[in-house]
Amino acid sequence: MKKYLFSAITVLFVSLVLAGCSYGDGTPISSLDDSSMPIRRYDLLQMRYLTTGDYSALQKMRSTYIVETRALVESLLKIGVLGESGMNERILEYYEDSTLSAAIEDVNKTFANMDKENEQLRICLNRMQRLLPEVELPDVYTQIGDFEQSIVVCGRKVGISLEKYLGPDYPVYKRFFDEQQRKQMTREYMIPECMSIYLLSQFPFGDFQNISQAKRDFHLQCVWYVVNKLLGEEFFGRSETSKVDAFMQMHKDMSLSELLNYSRQEMSKVSGASAENAK
């Protein structure tokens, strides 16, 4: 659990860096029917541009997907500002790296069909509307990054980097990640991590440095407990939600929204006390 906890916190910090960005005139999701495909395949546009230089794909990346492209270029790849002269060529050059070129091809093969993930996310979002009505539904898309971050959040938009979910035996992973990390780099973790990081961005830690490890762990367990409810299964096992399971047994009338707000308020109390003591 500790390795996963560290990974989740690391991704959260990157998410919060992007949280203040503007996301244009995107329309919030209000409902999802059985035919909806809630995951938008931005990665397919990337592939078209990166493998063929298709100008129409580039135009769509810089219009329909302007926020996603800006987040990719400026915050994930960190290769400059999107509107800079020569940026189109710079993007192409960046992905000419042999490791990334191979990843593009492998992502294309592995994720040719994402029906299972779409269905899993659709179920989560429908449950979120009912169980967390005050939380705006995330706008989820897929992308190809550079093996640095699995999930990025920009306000309501959540980007899933598919190159981080190619399976524990993917050759590149063995060079950079330990065995425990590789076990989590499978497509089964994609939607649970997506929902976890999005909820952490909506119910953040606050003053992270002044919060005890016990409070951090409890808040993460609260998020995982809620994600289990959204998934309709115990993806995060009892060992990872044991404290919250016990807490909810004593507070059976508490809603999921109340649980997350309670945990966040408890951390605020600790942060406030720490700040006062520091004066």
Regions flagged by a language model, labelled:
Residues M1-I9:
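Bacterial N-terminal signal peptides that target proteins for export
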Residues T10, T27, T51-T52, T64, ...:
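Residue-identity detector for threonine
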Residues V17-G20:
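C-terminal motif of bacterial Sec signal peptides marking the signal peptidase cleavage site
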Residues S22-L92:
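N-terminal mature-domain "stem" immediately C-terminal to a signal peptide or N-terminal signal-anchor/transmembrane
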Residues R90-K279:
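Acidic/His-rich structured neighborhood in mature extracellular/periplasmic domains
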